Amino acid sequence: MVNVMNTLSFASLSFNSNNTPVSEQFDDIYFSTQDGLEESYYVFQDGNQLWQKWQTHDVESFVIAETGFGTGLNFLAVADKFQQFLSEFPNSKLKRLYFISFEKFPLTSEQLATIHKNYPQFATLSQKMTACWQPRQTGCQRYHFEQIYLDVWFGDMLDNLPQLGDLYTNRIDAWFLDGFSPDKNPEMWNETLYRQMFSLTKNGGSFATFTAASTVRKGLQAVGFEVKKRKGFGKKREMLWGEKPQQSETAPVNYPYFYSESQTEANDIAVVGGGVASLFVVLSLLEKGKKVTLYCKDNALAQNASGNLQGAIYPQLSDDDERNIRFYVHCFDYALQRLSQIEPLVEFEHALTGVALYAYNDKTAKKLEKIARQTNDDSLFKLCSAAELSEKIGLKVPNGGAFMPQSGWLSPIQFVQGTFAYLQTKGLQIVLNHEVKDPQFSEGKWHWQHNGKTFSHQILVLANGHTLTQFQQAQGIPLYPVRGQVSQIPTTPALQQLKCVVCYDGYLTPVSKANTHCIGASHVRDKAETYFSLEEHHENVAKLQQNLTACDWTQGIDESQNLAKQGVRAALRDRVPMVGQMPNFSVQKVQYQNLYNQLRRKQAVENAANFANLYMVNGLASRGLTTAPLLGEMLASLICDEPLPISEDIWHVLSPNRTWIRKLLKGSKVE
């Protein structure tokens, strides 16, 4: 069994006589004993001439990459400086800073907070960062601080750098070549790093580093950088800095069949939806400065699957594909961060008091044991005995299972409607009772007719669940509807003691403010009707009583009120969503009919044929509360041509054309 999440090791930290943090792994200091902050300003900010570059930058985002996050001091210093820049130059074209950093041995949030106490000028940003800092697995974790985005790639940098992939080529404006010194950490300072750096750097992009080692200078020159020397910081005689020549050739696309286009010049975006998937696309697009209009076919928002009174939020950890597990854990951590940001702004019922996974039969028990072998993070998932699980649940259960302490529930309908209302105060336009039909692209815009009027937008995003297949552009997307009915029951004296969500072959939520619980949910594939089903209502309650058969607290349930919410989920057979540019299926199946042989013969392959300015996010199924925040951020980043917070291997798993590309890569025919 592959343990997909235990490859991350934390730093062994000590402090020297100057109270400077020291890595015991590398036997090296994290920053100068003279003045770590001044060293950061001098070496990296001045070395890359950031203040001057920001004033003349001609796009809305600036991307810095750093080779060792360490204490986060470089990030805090440059973030603080960027906030000063925005204050001093409010009309600048540049609006957002992306700071991409790599860290093999992360410090804990407690260690970071201790070190940051020496820099009270950064206290606010440090507190925000350490509050959500939880290195859990290898790969990218995005953190938001208004106009500043921090992406930390945990794990070995030489493994992570290639995972930045095609969408990062020619993307990085400046490098902070930090990390421990070349003689202490020779594994990092090598040709592989320099070659990847050169590919990822924009023409004219720069780097700066504290070292002047000849091996580093020659290595950077060998891959194409122009390398120069300047006075080193403090007692150091010299340091290196340099640039990528303006006339450098762009690196070829490695995966042209998964290629997507961005639209940096387009500002006017229409989003079709009304549920949680569209909500987070809209949120991220607004944060990136776009003008957004939401079109919803219903007379109110959150009328479909996002309209439940209570819904669980937790990651899907059961999967044979470790990329899927990594995706869901990334999503979960990002969702928790987003919820903490929205919580002060919007009123919605929620309680992150945990989710109990009940082992109602031997098969489920073995499945939970398998998951436990894939993670050593008890804050995410922990096996429990019957006594332990009973204590977590608040009611006695005869079997054990597992507990996910950071998970919980929220009210989707309150959350979605409340957050959309908040976003209207930030410029979002919402149009209800408007079904977008038969959109056509011409002269750089998408157009459609509604009630005798023409509506036009530069970009169209389809985040409309199972109705996606009504658009002819979605031909070939193997989406199918799943009808679900969630039952609502009045509480009982026993059920009022329920502390957390309980999952079995269904789920039961704790009591809401309305003194009700939700029991869910039926699963009827290929059905899109939303009528009340008495049979499904009875089945929901029966599942609870049958799965927790020895629990007398399940027996006194009153189901006579026949209260339930029906919704239709959009699902995909491989159980992960789709996000990206809309692929043109009819063209791609011809374009790539000989893909297997082209790759085998190392022949050139065209970039994928997609519909211009048309994007989608779909297939969230029953995991929308967990996955929608990161999916929305990914899609907005793609549209805006800004760094994606996900590794390339997972991005390919989420690609809208993945089902037929997989077949074509094997030499199979696609009809």
Curated annotation (Swiss-Prot):
Domain of life of the organism encoding this protein: Bacteria
Main location: cytoplasm
The entry's keywords: Cytoplasm, FAD, Flavoprotein, Methyltransferase, Multifunctional enzyme, Oxidoreductase, S-adenosyl-L-methionine, Transferase, tRNA processing
Cofactor: FAD
Gene Ontology BP term (one): tRNA wobble uridine modification
Gene3D superfamilies: D-Amino Acid Oxidase, subunit A, domain 2, FAD/NAD(P)-binding domain, Vaccinia Virus protein VP39
Region (tRNA (mnm(5)s(2)U34)-methyltransferase): 1-245
Localization (cell): Cytoplasm
Alphabetized InterPro entries for the sequence: FAD-dep_OxRdtase (IPR006076), FAD/NAD-bd_sf (IPR036188), MnmC-like_methylTransf (IPR008471), SAM-dependent_MTases_sf (IPR029063), tRNA_MAMT_biosynth_bifunc_MnmC (IPR023032), tRNA_MNMC2 (IPR047785), tRNA_S-uridine_synth_MnmC_C (IPR017610)
Catalytic activity: 5-aminomethyl-2-thiouridine(34) in tRNA + S-adenosyl-L-methionine = 5-methylaminomethyl-2-thiouridine(34) in tRNA + S-adenosyl-L-homocysteine + H(+)
Pfam families named among the record's database cross-references: DAO, Methyltransf_30
Signal peptide, first to last residue: none
Family that this chain belongs to: In the N-terminal section; belongs to the methyltransferase superfamily. tRNA (mnm(5)s(2)U34)-methyltransferase family. In the C-terminal section; belongs to the DAO family.
Function: Catalyzes the last two steps in the biosynthesis of 5-methylaminomethyl-2-thiouridine (mnm(5)s(2)U) at the wobble position (U34) in tRNA. Catalyzes the FAD-dependent demodification of cmnm(5)s(2)U34 to nm(5)s(2)U34, followed by the transfer of a methyl group from S-adenosyl-L-methionine to nm(5)s(2)U34, to form mnm(5)s(2)U34.
Protein name according to UniProt: tRNA 5-methylaminomethyl-2-thiouridine biosynthesis bifunctional protein MnmC
Organism the protein comes from: Actinobacillus pleuropneumoniae serotype 3 (strain JL03)
